[in-house]
């Protein structure tokens, strides 16, 4: 492990909330007291962005640590702050043709908001601003009636910011690449809380505090970095699909912990924190990783620990979920914000099966979330266990699940071709043949539509045609 540790808080929080965790790391003799550092950042400033935080963090890192490799623990929104910093630092070095370095050796993410929080939209409301101003001990006078608009838009499910950031650190040559030399590799680890705030007074006030598939704040499947990206390109309405090549680790350590929610997962005083299958059992192992082989071995331990936790969870928390994060654009890379995506089940003869279509709509399609500032980005979170059961039904019925996508443009002389894509054909494949369903993950789906322009928009003519009356 590195000699020094930096702890990064989440949205509307502050460093004072993390001193117990820092003291725990010192008590475990993982770091000396003087080598544990904390961050405070203005997450409730409406104008502050993740890039602002990343730039200042980079300056402070250079000033304090002077290029020394450090370890980082981050909570919730802090994960996006750190990932933005790492991406920003490397991209800057590339642009300026500077020497590459990797400032972070071990990155421990506690309940990270890697792919969204259902509370982020509420935080942008007037009620959210009042709460941030009058009921938050971390609020600042200069942020009066502010709640961090730019940060919260980045935190929303289906955030364009999350899409772009993922492109940097998961699908390009970045710090999570096992093929890099060892001192240019950052080893990330995901510690996800497995319980929400169900039954609490807060959950009675805010229903999303007890939303299934979440830890009361972030989506559990959205904490994982085991993300895949699929491009669906439609030329003349015909689909061509391609999985983006991955540069990151094939299996980033991920574990879900029973008995802990979004807030309590950072509290070492919690009984569930230190139990045999709790986070404490894996923190020291994560920090001891020195090579890609070590990392692979620890990833297996995370997986085993996660399954142990699922085995002792209550029925309300045991189901696993998956997110499908859609971005719709056209073949000239313009975002398509006005579109309708409809899932349909066809029977063996190719006709619509109304019963199975209704069953899919009732159980899955209602989970679509559209980003508040950019409707070209949408996400659907589905219960993986229910989805698997639905596909078993399709196999028995020899049915096919497809989606139809229709879209409009603001230009009357530009049209999009309506498209259809076969998601799963129960007559041809069994459930074991499903290639794009992975529990506790987010799958990015990049949909590219074919646009057609009329001659009224632009028309190339011959000389004779021009001279015709």
Where are these regions (language model features)?
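A short, amphipathic beta-strand motif
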Residues: 322-330, 343
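Short amphipathic, basic-aromatic surface patches that mediate peripheral association
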Residues: 311-312, 328-335
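Short, surface-exposed "cap/lid" segments of acyl-processing enzymes
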Residues: 1-38
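Tryptophan-paired
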Residues: 151-155, 160-165, 352-399
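Serine-dependent carboxylesterase/thioesterase catalytic core
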Residues: 5-11, 36, 50-170, 200, ...
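Extracellular beta-sheet/turn segments enriched in Thr/Pro/Gly and aliphatic residues
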Residues: 297-316, 404-469
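Helical cap/lid subdomain of alpha/beta-hydrolase-fold lipid enzymes
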Residues: 87, 101-310
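Short, ordered, surface-exposed loop/turn motifs in non-cytosolic proteins
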Residues: 332-353
């Amino acid at each position: 492990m590195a000699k020094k540790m930096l702890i990064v808080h989440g949205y509307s929080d502050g460093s004072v909330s993390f001193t117990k965790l820092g003291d725990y790391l010192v008590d475990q003799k993982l770091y000396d007291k003087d080598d544990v550092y904390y961050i405070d950042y203005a997450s409730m400033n409406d104008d502050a962005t993740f890039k602002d935080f990343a730039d200042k963090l980079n300056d402070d890192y250079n000033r304090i640590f002077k290029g020394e490799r450090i370890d980082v623990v981050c909570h919730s929104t802090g994960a996006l702050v750190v990932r933005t910093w790492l991406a920003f630092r490397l991209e800057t070095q590339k642009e300026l043709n500077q020497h590459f370095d990797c400032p972070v050796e071990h990155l421990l993410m506690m309940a990270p908001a890697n792919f969204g929080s259902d509370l982020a939209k509420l935080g942008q409301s007037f009620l959210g601003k009042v709460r941030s101003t009058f009921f938050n001990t971390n609020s600042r006078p200069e942020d009066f009636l502010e709640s961090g608009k730019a940060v919260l838009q980045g935190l929303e499910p289906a955030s364009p910011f999350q899409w772009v950031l993922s492109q940097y650190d998961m699908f390009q040559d970045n710090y999570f690449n096992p093929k890099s030399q060892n001192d240019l590799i950052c080893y990330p680890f995901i510690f996800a809380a497995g319980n929400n705030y169900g039954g609490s007074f807060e959950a009675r006030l805010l229903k999303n505090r007890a939303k299934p598939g979440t830890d009361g704040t972030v989506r559990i499947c959205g904490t994982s970095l085991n993300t895949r990206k699929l491009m669906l390109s439609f030329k003349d309405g015909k689909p061509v699909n391609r999985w983006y090549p991955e540069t990151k680790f094939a299996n980033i350590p991920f574990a879900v912990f029973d008995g802990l929610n979004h807030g309590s997962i950072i509290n070492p005083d919690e009984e569930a924190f230190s139990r045999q299958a709790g986070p404490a059992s894996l923190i020291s192992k994560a920090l001891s990783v020195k090579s890609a082989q070590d990392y692979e071995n620890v990833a297996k331990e995370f997986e085993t620990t996660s399954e142990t936790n699922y085995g002792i969870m209550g029925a309300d928390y045991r189901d696993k979920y998956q997110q499908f994060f859609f971005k719709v654009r056209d073949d000239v890379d313009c975002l398509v914000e006005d579109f309708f995506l409809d899932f349909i089940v066809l029977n063996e003869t190719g006709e619509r099966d109304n019963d199975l279509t209704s069953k899919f709509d009732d159980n899955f399609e209602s989970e679509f979330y559209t980003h508040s500032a950019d409707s070209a980005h949408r996400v659907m979170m589905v219960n993986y266990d229910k989805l698997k059961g639905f596909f078993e039904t399709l196999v028995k019925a020899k049915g096919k699940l497809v989606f139809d996508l229709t879209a409009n443009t603001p230009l009357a002389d530009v049209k999009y071709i309506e498209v259809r894509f076969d998601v799963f054909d129960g007559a041809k494949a069994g459930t074991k043949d499903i290639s794009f369903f992975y529990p506790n993950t987010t799958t990015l789906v990049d949909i590219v539509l074919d646009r057609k322009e009329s001659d009224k928009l632009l028309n190339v003519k011959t000389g004779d045609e021009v001279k015709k009356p």
